[in-house]
Amino acid sequence: MKVAVIGSGGREHTLAWSLVRSPEVSHCYCLPGNGGTAGLPKTENVAIAVDQLGEICEFCQTEKINLVVVGPELPLTLGLTDQLQALGIKVFGPTKAGAELEASKSWTKQLLIEAGVPTAFGETFTEPAPAQAYATKMGAPIVVKADGLAAGKGVIVAQTSAEATTAIAELFDQGFEKIVVEEFLPGEEVSVLALCDGKTVIPLLPAQDHKRIGEGDQGLNTGGMGAYCPAPIAPPAVIDQVQKQILQPTANALAKRGIDYRGVLYAGLMVSPTGEIKVLEYNCRFGDPETQAVLPLLATPLEKVLMACVEQNLEQLGPLQWHSGNAVCVVVAAGGYPGSYRKGDEINGLAEAEAQDVKVFHAGTELKEGKVLTNGGRVLGVTALGKDLSTAIATAYRGVEQIDFDGMYYRRDIGHKAL
């Protein structure tokens, strides 16, 4: 079968890498792909951007693509799935209506309340003054969220009322029409990515992401500086609870609204010190860098799983098979990220890193005249497997140490809180 992966990040390199390992997949096109997908067997980069919906549809029709896998949220919220489906092309990823789950925090909050899914208490506002008054009344710490896509950076945990007031003003100044102000939930975060075919929901192994740029979870929020899987905070009994109380009720609520949701339900959850689980947010696609830690542990062929979602027969698939052990992904970023950063620096040591028994997934890279150059804030994700978490961590960092480019930065504490 011929597949197309839409996107250019570490998540998309991981998806393409997982897909082409199967003998069932004859060819994989990455639109537009990156420096890593350029070197994968059976894989070809195609210079079409993720928001060029017409060109994507035309390409998939011409090439007779059997399955399109959409990586990022943007094309989903623009309605790429709807357009491909109208042409009779099979696509993994929700329709525009389903992508509201990530595109609108207020819409999702309403859906969760209606479905009786536990989530943080909060209110939605369309003007700064009432939002600021509400935040002051609630007291700090308090959470301020942009109602719209903000590339994973639209959530501010304000430690003081003054900080909340500033954050609210800034989000409205940035052009967001609505914001959500909600209670701060203490505890430990976990990401549960689940597959949904519109009826059945199957959770993947739980992962934990590291959002802050600095060690010890200090500094600015990023798209994610590393992840490990499975996360011990969510053992199988907890995942069963998540399935029954959160994932399945969400899928049912979507179906009740007439939304045929076939794709990833990514639940960002908070596990309180007493073991209570609440939804912080939903995303409508694979997480990045969680995907780089979760998919290498999946033993069931990925294309089989995704096709079962698209063809609405997840129930017939049976339980997913997993490799034993743990996976860790350490993200290597460009100096200055998440602020302004340089591009175009040559990356050395990639082959030496992979000789350390790691897999290097490319994110912000491009291949130019045979050289791999930096081309984004998060540049690489170095993934290692191990019989236990400490082995996987040690192997991942051995790999990272082989890599070198100007201004390279990475956190040295990925996975440590689970040791």
From Swiss-Prot:
Its cofactor is Mg(2+); Mn(2+). GO terms for molecular function: ATP binding; metal ion binding; phosphoribosylamine-glycine ligase activity. Pathway: Purine metabolism; IMP biosynthesis via de novo pathway; N(1)-(5-phospho-D-ribosyl)glycinamide from 5-phospho-alpha-D-ribose 1-diphosphate: step 2/2. ATP binds at residues 135-191. InterPro entries: ATP-grasp, ATP_grasp_subdomain_1, PreATP-grasp_dom_sf, PRibGlycinamid_synth_ATP-grasp, PRibGlycinamide_synth, PRibGlycinamide_synth_C-dom, PRibGlycinamide_synth_C_sf, PRibGlycinamide_synth_CS. Its EC number is 6.3.4.13. It catalyses: 5-phospho-beta-D-ribosylamine + glycine + ATP = N(1)-(5-phospho-beta-D-ribosyl)glycinamide + ADP + phosphate + H(+). Pfam families: GARS_A, GARS_C, GARS_N. SUPFAM superfamilies: Glutathione synthetase ATP-binding domain-like, PreATP-grasp domain, Rudiment single hybrid motif. Binds 1 Mg(2+) or Mn(2+) ion per subunit. One of its GO terms (biological process) is purine nucleobase biosynthetic process. It comes from the Bacteria. Keywords: ATP-binding, Ligase, Magnesium, Manganese, Metal-binding, Nucleotide-binding, Purine biosynthesis. Residues 109-311 form the ATP-grasp domain. Mg(2+) binds at residues 281, 283. NCBIfam families: purD. Belongs to the GARS family. This is Phosphoribosylamine--glycine ligase. It comes from Synechocystis sp. (strain ATCC 27184 / PCC 6803 / Kazusa). The gene is purD.
